[in-house]
Every structure is written in structure tokens, then in C-alpha cells.
Amino acid sequence: MERVVKKANPTLFDKAFGYIQDALATNLLWLNHVLPQAERLVKEINGRKVYTPNIYVGENEYEQILPDAQDIGNYSFFILEEPQEVHYEVGSRVKMSSPFSLIVWLDIRSVYNEDLRDMEMVKRDILRAIRRTWMRNGHFHIERIYQRAENIFKEFTMDEVDNQFLMQPYCGFRFRGEIEIEEECEL
């Protein structure tokens, strides 16, 4: 998998997420993979539904991106939450807004090359990186940060996200905020 995975020919929110991906990739060299918006897929295991985050990799294939999915290293991805609001008046640009989350998971040893658990320093570095985002025709802000597994991966089946993947040396965050875009398009 490439370090920065973007959707081909992105529009609307995917295009805006691409700007944030660029800032993350440029400013957080410890991120092995800077991924686009994830899709929530469902599979049945032992008669029960299990929900997982996945990214589309082409040719009708998806790659699961939970911490235990495979050895993908430190990574980030986006979740576009609902509802998406549309503001449109005839003769003007379309404005859309939506809550969103940036999920970041990492092995803290690869960030500082030490056996320390300074999660506040990691949060600071991530906030500094996304603050450097230049976004054409849009803006975003972060309102909340979550650290507990049940909040970071709340849309997904908790059994699949064992808490061991948030114990030393691993940690994760959910940066939740609001994103607004403007687009020239016909409705």
C-alpha cells in the first residue's frame, strides 16, 4: 500500500480530505499510511454482524484497517458522519457541511524512538500538522478528541478492536470536528 492513498478524481468531501492528508503526510513523517475516507462494511461471523472500517483498493477489493488487520504501521483515516447538510440557492455555489472524524493509530515508539508514553505530545503534534492545512473552497475545525477504544472506533464492532491495541506501546485518537465545503455544481 502506498504511503498516501487518495481517492481517484476526488470531489466534495473527499477532495477536502485530500488537503488534510497532504498536511498530515508532510508534517507527520512517522505516519506510514495516510488513508482516505473509510467505508463501514459488515460481515457475518458466527451468526452475528461485525462492522469494520475499510478502504477501497480497486478491482472490487477492500482492505480492512483496524489496528489488528495487518501490519500497516502507523496510520490515519477519515470518517464522514451524518447528517450532511446542503445549503443551496439558485445562482450560487453549493455549500455542504458535515461532522467528521480523523482517526489516528500508532506505535508510540516509532514516533519518539523512546519507551515513553507521552500521548499529549502526540496530540499536540497532530493538531499542529492539521492546523497547517490549506484547503481551497472549504474549512474545518476540530471540536473534540477521544482516546478510549470504544470512542475511537465507535462505528465498528468493539470485539474486533481489542483494548490491547491501545496499551503501551500503541495509542490512538479520534479528532472530531466539522467540515464545510463549497462547490460549483448543478443540483
Model features per residue range: what roles?
Residues 1-91:
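Small/polar-rich, solvent-exposed N-terminal microdomains that initiate assembly or binding
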Residues 42-46, 97-99, 103-105, 110-139:
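Acidic, Ser/Thr- and Gly-enriched intrinsically disordered low-complexity segments
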Residues 60, 66-80, 156-164, 173-187:
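Aromatic/basic-lined ligand-recognition segments
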Residues 92-110, 165-183:
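Oligomerization/assembly interface segments of phage tail-like spikes and tubes
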Residues 119-178:
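Acidic-leaning, charged glycine-interspersed low-complexity segments
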